[in-house]
A protein has these predicted regions:
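Internal nucleotide-binding/catalytic subdomain
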Residues: 157-292
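Solvent-exposed alpha-helices and their adjacent loops that cap or buttress functional pockets
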Residues: 21, 38, 91, 113-115, ...
Length: 420
C-alpha cells in the first residue's frame, strides 16, 4: 500500500512517520514535505499544496490508496472535494465542512444554533460598529480575524484601546487581507485552555488524548502568538468528567449539527476548549490536526494508524488503542525572530536517536547535502514519553542543552502548568 500526506511541517512529519510504521505500507510520500523527513525514510514529492490537479495526477500515477491532508488552507481551498471528484479517497473534511475553521463567524453560528457553549460575540465588517461594540462591552476582550491567519489572527486585548487598534488593523489596514475583512469580537473567558481531538466520520467519532499547547513565543506565556511552541498529552490534571462533558455538550452536537446542515464531517476535528467556572466552552474549531499537538499525540497511539484511518474512510469501526504510560511532551525549536522576521540557513544539530524523536518542520539540506539547515520559522521539535511531566521535561531539556542551538530559540517551560 502506498500513501500520500499533503503538507510540509512537523505535523505532516509525525503523520507520515506513524503511517510508515504499518506493516501494510510500502511507501509514504509527502508533498511537498521538507528535507528532514527523508531521515525517516519518507519520500518527498515536489508539488505544492495548492497544486491540486498535479497532486491528483501524482496519486493516480503512483497508485496511492488514500491521501491524508494536513494543512488548513488546502482544506479550505477544497482539496478533498477535488480528490473525491477524481475518484480518490482523502482523509479530511470537504470545503463546506472545513468552514468550521475557515470562518470563525460560521463556527459561532453553528454553536449558537446547536446550543454549544462558547463566548458571547458580535461579527462586524464595519469598523465604527465594531468600535462601538468594544466600547460598550469593555475589556479584556478578544478580537479575531474571521478567516485563516496562520494562528496569528487573534488578539487578546487588555484594554479597549488595544482592541480598537487590532480591529482597525484588520478591517481598515488589511493586515490579514480577505481573512480580516470581517472580525469576530468576543468576551474574554477565564480558565485553563486545552485541546480535544477526534477522528470523525459523520456522527461516528473517536476521541484522542487531551493535549495542552503553548501558543506564546516566550517563557511565562509572554510575547506574540505563534503556531505553537510546544505541547504535552494527556493533560494530567484534567478530570475525565470534563472530557465527558465536552464530548456530550460540544463534540456530539456539533457533528450532528453539521450533518443537519448538509455538511457531514470526515477527518480530524480539533476543539480548542477552555475550562471555565461554568464548564468547558469552545474557543475555536480547527478542521485538522494541530501543530505541535499531532507530534505529541500520535506517539501515544499503539494501534495500527494506517489500518485505523483505512477503516474510518471505509465506514468501518476502527480498533484504536492508546498507551496509558505517563505523558508525552515536546518542545519546538524555532528560528530567532519567529513569529516575525526570522533568519534562515542555520546549521541544525544531528537527529536524535532512542527515546527522543525529532520531527522536522522548516529544514533543508545544504547545497552539498551534508548538513540540514533551518528553512522556516519553526524548525524542529523534540518529543519524548516518560512517567511524569517532570521526567519528560528533564529528558528534552538536557538534550537541548547539549545541542548547538545558536541562531535558534525555544521555551524552557513547556509542561510546567502540569507540575503542581
Amino acid at each position: 500500500m502506498k500513501l500520500l500526506v499533503v503538507g510540509s511541517g512537523g505535523r505532516e512529519h509525525a503523520i507520515a512517520k506513524k503511517l510508515l510504521e504499518s506493516k501494510d505500507v510500502e511507501k509514504v510520500f509527502v508533498a511537498p514535505g521538507n528535507d528532514g523527513m527523508t531521515l525517516d525514510g519518507l519520500e518527498l514529492v515536489n508539488i505544492s499544496i495548492s497544486e491540486h490537479s498535479k497532486l491528483i495526477e501524482f496519486a493516480k500515477a503512483n497508485d496511492i490508496a488514500w491521501s491524508f491532508i494536513g494543512p488548513d488552507d488546502a482544506l479550505a481551498a477544497g482539496i478533498v472535494d477535488e480528490f473525491n471528484a477524481a475518484g480518490l479517497k482523502a482523509f479530511g473534511p470537504t470545503r463546506l465542512a472545513a468552514e468550521l475553521e475557515w470562518s470563525k463567524d460560521f463556527a459561532k453560528e453553528i454553536m449558537v444554533k446547536y446550543d454549544v457553549p462558547t463566548a458571547a460575540y458580535g461579527t462586524f465588517s464595519d469598523f465604527e460598529e465594531a468600535k462601538a461594540y468594544i466600547e460598550e462591552k469593555g475589556s479584556p476582550i478578544v478580537v479575531k480575524a474571521d478567516g485563516l491567519a496562520l494562528g496569528k489572527g487573534v488578539v487578546v486585548a487588555e484594554t479597549v484601546e488595544q482592541a480598537v487598534e487590532a480591529t482597525h488593523e484588520m478591517l481598515l489596514d488589511n493586515k490579514f487581507g480577505d481573512s480580516g475583512a470581517r472580525v469576530v469580537v468576543e468576551e474574554f473567558l477565564e480558565g485553563e485552555e486545552f485541546s480535544l481531538f477526534a477522528f470523525v466520520n459523520g456522527d461516528k467519532f473517536y476521541i484522542m488524548p487531551t493535549a495542552q499547547d503553548h501558543k506564546r513565543a516566550y517563557d511565562g506565556d509572554k510575547g506574540p502568538n505563534t503556531g505553537g511552541m510546544g505541547a504535552y498529552a494527556p493533560v494530567p490534571h484534567l478530570p475525565e468528567s470534563v472530557v465527558d462533558t465536552a464530548v456530550d455538550t460540544i463534540v456530539k452536537p456539533v457533528l450532528e449539527g453539521m450533518i443537519q446542515e448538509g455538511r457531514p464531517y470526515l477527518g480530524v476535528l480539533y476543539a480548542g476548549l477552555i475550562l471555565t467556572a461554568d464548564g468547558p466552552k469552545v474557543i475555536e474549531f480547527n478542521a485538522r490536526f494541530g501543530d505541535p499537538e499531532t507530534q505529541i499525540i500520535l506517539p501515544r497511539l499503539t494501534s495500527d494508524f494506517t489500518q485505523n484511518i483505512t477503516d474510518i474512510l471505509d465506514g468501518k469501526e476502527p480498533s484504536i488503542t492508546w498507551t496509558d504510560k505517563g505523558v508525552t511532551l515536546g518542545v519546538v525549536v524555532a528560528s530567532n525572530g519567529y513569529p516575525l522576521d526570522y533568519e534562515k540557513g542555520v546549521e541544525l544539530p544531528a537527529k536524535t536517536e532512542g527515546d527522543i524523536i525529532t520531527y522536522y518542520a522548516g529544514a533543508k539540506f545544504s547545497e552539498n547535502s551534508r548538513a540540514l539547515l533551518s528553512n522556516g520559522g519553526r524548525v524542529y521539535m523534540l518529543v519524548t514519553t516518560a512517567d511524569t511531566v517532570k521526567e519528560a521535561q528533564d529528558t528534552i531539556y538536557s538534550e537541548l542543552n547539549k545541542q548547538n542551538t545558536e541562531g535558534l530559540f525555544y521555551r524552557t517551560d513547556i509542561g510546567s502548568k502540569a507540575i503542581r
